[in-house]
Structure formats: structure tokens, C-alpha cells
Regions:
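Intrinsically disordered, low-complexity terminal regions
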Residues: 2-249
Length: 249
């Protein structure tokens, strides 16, 4: 029988100043996207990558392939304002550097109210044979059905969300620092760490890990629908709560 150690620290009041740029997405007012992405001409040349960093308003759809293709496709078809779409094409850059693809803007861009909703925003389709890091800094969303990697790091820093159906990784690190949320339906591997520091929440459906550590330090919550594994350690120093259903067999 596997042994399980569970440690829950008492919650204490946690107050921290947060610098968040609100874009009023979905409102009737004009919002603004800001960017200061730096690059060289060589950075714009397509190269293999294992990490993704998105710092803008967009919906990102990632697909892992079993070949050697690394590609990024920008789809502007959902944007109904032709003038805004053209300005976005001029400002957006896809930078390939140090094994990472970074997508962002080179300056400020006002977003019309009609382009604020998710259904009318830019769609980004990304594929690669391997993925070791996801960084979401913008207001958009990141979606993936399945990711299989030796290690995977998820860093959600903005207002947006990360939603992944299935992750298989020897080591999985999830950091949620902003207002957005991280949702994983199934996670399986050896070691997993969840660090929830912001206002948002982290939810994992079924977790099968040899070792899982949860640190909840912000206002948001962490939910584990079902944990099965060796060791589970929970530290709750924030205002939010941590809830977990555990298989002790």
C-alpha cells in the first residue's frame, strides 16, 4: 500500500498589490493592446521550437504532432473590422529565438468594441513535435487537447486562461500568477507542482502523480477533483481555498 502524507497549513490573510492592465474585453468601449516586442531580422525566420510565449489578445490552439513540423498560423478571418485587422497585421510579430516562439506586438493598438469578444478575435494555430513550456501573458486563451512531454511548464501570467484536456509528463509545473485560470482535465506523470499566486484559479480533474505539491498563496482557489498517487502536500497561505478528493488506497 502506498503511503500518503497530507499537510494543510492554516490560511492567513494575503494582501498584495497587483499591476493589471484591464482591457475591458467584451465591453462596448474601445480597449487597447500594448506591446514592445524586440527582434532582429533573423528572429523572424522560422526555426524549430519547444516553447510558446503569447503576449497579446488572441485565442491559441496548440496541436502536438508526431513528425518534425514546427509551424505557426495566424487566422484573421474572425475579425470583422478590416481596418483593425490590417493594423494588427502590421503590429504583430512572430519571433523565433532560443528554441522558443514568441508572439506579440511592436507597439500600441486600439481594439474596436466589436473585436473585443473571443469569437471575433485573432486565432493562432501552433503545432510542434514537443513542448516544454507555455507562457500566457495576454488576455486571450490557450487550448490543447493532448500534450506528451518529458517535462512541461505552464506559466499563466495575464488575464487569460489555459485549458488542456490531457497531459502526460514526468515533471509538470503549473504557475498561475494573474487573473486568469488554468484548467487540466487529466494529468499523469511522476512529479507535479502547482503554484497559484494570483486572483485566478487552478482546476485539475484526474491527477495520477507520484508526488504532488500545491502552494496556494493568492486570492484564487485550487481544486483537485481526484488525486491518486504517492505523496500530496498542500500549503494554503492565501485567501482562497484548496479542495482535493484523494484515493488513499
Amino acid at each position: 500500500m502506498k503511503t500518503m502524507s497530507i499537510w494543510v497549513a492554516s490560511a492567513t490573510l494575503f494582501l498584495a498589490s497587483m499591476g493589471i492592465c484591464s482591457c475591458s474585453m467584451g465591453s462596448t468601449t474601445t480597449s487597447e493592446m500594448r506591446g514592445s516586442l524586440e527582434f532582429t531580422q533573423d528572429d523572424l525566420r522560422e526555426k524549430p521550437f519547444k516553447a510558446i510565449d503569447v503576449d497579446m489578445v488572441a485565442s491559441v490552439y496548440y496541436t502536438q504532432n508526431d513528425g518534425d513540423e514546427c509551424s505557426v498560423r495566424l487566422d484573421y478571418s474572425a475579425i470583422k473590422d478590416a481596418e483593425f485587422a490590417q493594423k494588427l497585421k502590421e503590429k504583430i510579430k512572430v519571433v523565433y529565438r532560443d528554441g522558443e516562439v514568441k508572439i506579440g506586438l511592436t507597439g500600441r493598438l486600439k481594439v474596436p468594441a466589436m473585436c473585443n469578444s473571443e469569437k471575433n478575435r485573432l486565432k493562432i494555430y501552433i503545432t510542434s513535435p514537443d513542448l516544454v513550456k507555455i507562457t500566457q501573458e495576454g488576455v486571450g486563451a490557450f487550448y490543447a487537447k493532448s500534450i506528451n512531454s518529458d517535462r512541461l511548464e505552464i506559466d499563466n501570467e495575464g488575464v487569460g486562461s489555459v485549458s488542456i484536456n490531457k497531459i502526460l509528463a514526468n515533471r509538470l509545473d503549473v504557475t498561475n500568477e494573474g487573473v486568469g485560470s488554468v484548467s487540466i482535465e487529466h494529468a499523469k506523470g511522476d512529479v507535479m507542482k502547482i503554484d497559484n499566486e494570483g486572483v485566478g484559479s487552478v482546476k485539475v480533474g484526474n491527477v495520477a502523480m507520484g508526488d504532488l505539491k500545491v502552494d496556494n498563496e493568492g486570492v484564487g482557489s485550487v481544486t483537485l477533483d481526484f488525486f491518486k498517487g504517492g505523496n500530496l502536500k498542500i500549503n494554503n497561505d492565501g485567501v482562497g481555498k484548496v479542495s482535493a478528493k484523494v484515493d488513499c488506497q
